[in-house]
């Protein structure tokens, strides 16, 4: 474990970070980020006096970046208490974690932490100090990215009743997760079932986590209501598309210094993340190829001028490979075995299993620098694997810009307020925020860009059948 428990001058030590001395740097960057996050800061100002999250004890599992620090401080400004961990072993910005710890917020995040560390920290964000009378205190809200915090409580509760659910791990990550659950159950056989019923709800940030929630609900396993933040238009069409359009290339270039112009860039998946990734590569004059399973998305890619191919075909021709599907083994061992010498392979989807990284463990790995590895095949060929197949934009870069994260985190904050304040209105299920709140976030964001919205006249509003103040589109409208 490469983390260290750092103790501050006020004896607050409920955190695990890399280096508390980085907090000054973190604070300076947080102040800059605030100026680029108009939507989130406007919500902080609007609701601060009302304290709508007073009494909320939020377990947060999301990338511990500078932008997330602004989110944490916003939740606290609205009355919440939080405990935080990163949702990815490589995505933490250590100076951001230090700034949050120095301010007295429990945070457990170190860039490059091990998988064992990761699951230990995910447990720690559910472990609150007892109250003044010595009574136990539990989380009552979850703010999740990828669904790991939600998964932990559900799987652990099942394991209390049937330990066999931990018998057959399917990956290195599951081995570490299952071992972590076994360790906690050995100390407290009801650790999970004591905490699960206390959760009022979860707000989920990303596509992969949303898929998990819908599947759990379909199977009757979801224990509390969830708000799907990912499918708010001002999240998915902005964070997923415009955020990836800027952060993908930043991560690749920081890692490799490669010239992108003229190279064949293969984008696996043409959803919102794939669209942004393809735009980024084309903007730097790459030859962009797209792989897709969905004929509609494939047709969109073709109409944008991209060449639509299969990965089987692209493998031996591509120079740069980017997975953004949310699926499993999109790039397999056999694909990588066919790739050119020095081909670059990376992922911008949430989990590392889009690329069959486990199959590469049999070969020699030569570390170039943090999160950049040469994989050396028996014939001497090398491919460059970035962030061990995890999120390249956060593993090798600093993630999305503050401005676009303002939209996402404004939605997260609104969702936390809505679910915490109106829990009785949400039976167990998966929900999205109403369109008028989506439009509110967009209005707040527009102010930063010196934009001017046209106002409908009464006659115009009546003619198209909408309210002058919106919402302007029906729920089924596709932006």
From Swiss-Prot:
Catalytic reaction list: S-adenosyl-L-homocysteine + H2O = L-homocysteine + adenosine
Cofactor: NAD(+)
Residues that hold NAD(+) according to the record: 206-208, 240, 269-274, 292, 327, 348-350, 393
EC class: hydrolase
Keywords tagged on the record: Cytoplasm, Hydrolase, NAD, One-carbon metabolism
One MF term in the entry's GO annotations: adenosylhomocysteinase activity
Pathway: Amino-acid biosynthesis; L-homocysteine biosynthesis; L-homocysteine from S-adenosyl-L-homocysteine: step 1/1
EC numbers for this chain: 3.13.2.1
Pfam families given in the database record: AdoHcyase, AdoHcyase_NAD
Highest taxon of source: Bacteria
Primary location group: cytoplasm
Cofactor binding comment, as recorded: Binds 1 NAD(+) per subunit.
GO BP: any one term: S-adenosylmethionine cycle
Annotated localization: Cytoplasm
Binding of substrate, residues: 65, 145, 205, 235, 239
GO cellular component term of the entry, any: cytosol
Role played: May play a key role in the regulation of the intracellular concentration of adenosylhomocysteine.
Protein family (similarity comment): Belongs to the adenosylhomocysteinase family.
Protein name: Adenosylhomocysteinase
């Amino acid at each position: 474990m490469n983390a260290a428990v750092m103790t501050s001058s006020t004896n607050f030590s409920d955190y695990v970070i890399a280096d508390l001395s980085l907090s000054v740097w973190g604070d300076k960057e947080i102040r800059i980020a605030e100026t680029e996050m108009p939507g989130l800061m406007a919500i902080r100002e609007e609701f601060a006096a009302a304290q709508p999250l007073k009494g909320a004890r939020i377990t947060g599992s999301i990338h511990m970046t500078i932008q997330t620090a602004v989110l944490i401080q916003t939740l606290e400004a609205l009355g919440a208490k939080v405990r935080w961990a990163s949702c990815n072993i490589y995505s933490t910005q250590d100076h951001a974690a230090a700034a949050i710890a120095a301010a007295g917020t429990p945070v457990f995040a170190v860039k490059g932490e091990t998988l064992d560390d990761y699951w230990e920290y995910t447990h720690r964000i559910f472990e609150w100090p007892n109250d003044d009378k010595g009574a136990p205190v539990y989380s009552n809200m979850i703010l999740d990215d990828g669904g790991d915090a939600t998964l932990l409580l559900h799987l652990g509760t099942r394991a209390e009743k049937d330990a066999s659910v931990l018998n057959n791990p399917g990956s290195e990550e599951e081995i570490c997760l299952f071992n972590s659950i076994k360790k906690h159950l050995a100390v407290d056989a009801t650790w999970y079932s004591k905490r699960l019923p206390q959760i009022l709800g979860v707000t989920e940030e990303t596509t992969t986590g949303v898929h998990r929630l819908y599947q759990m609900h379909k199977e009757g396993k979801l224990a509390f209501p969830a708000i799907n933040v990912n499918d708010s238009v001002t999240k998915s069409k902005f964070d997923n598309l415009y955020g990836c359009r800027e952060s993908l290339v930043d991560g690749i270039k920081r890692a490799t210094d490669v010239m992108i112009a003229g190279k064949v860039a293969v984008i696996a998946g043409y959803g919102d993340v794939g669209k942004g990734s393809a735009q980024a590569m084309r903007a730097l004059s790459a030859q962009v190829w797209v792989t897709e399973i969905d004929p509609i998305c494939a047709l969109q890619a073709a109409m944008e001028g991209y060449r639509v191919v299969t990965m089987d075909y692209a493998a031996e021709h591509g120079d740069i490979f980017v997975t953004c599907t949310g699926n499993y083994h999109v790039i397999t061992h056999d694909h990588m075995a066919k790739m050119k010498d020095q081909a670059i392979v990376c992922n911008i989807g949430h989990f590392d299993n889009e690329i069959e990284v486990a199959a590469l463990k049999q070969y020699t790995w030569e570390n170039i620098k943090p999160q950049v590895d040469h994989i050396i095949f028996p014939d001497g060929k090398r491919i460059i694997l970035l962030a061990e197949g995890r999120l390249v934009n956060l593993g090798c870069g600093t993630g999305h810009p503050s401005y676009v994260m303002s939209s996402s985190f404004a939605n997260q904050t609104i969702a936390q307020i809505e679910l915490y304040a109106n829990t009785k209105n949400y039976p167990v299920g998966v929900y999205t925020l109403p369109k008028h709140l989506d439009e509110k976030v967009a209005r707040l964001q527009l102010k930063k860009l010196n934009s001017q919205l046209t106002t409908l006249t009464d006659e115009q509003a009546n003619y198209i059948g909408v309210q002058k103040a919106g919402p302007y589109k029906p729920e089924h409208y596709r932006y």
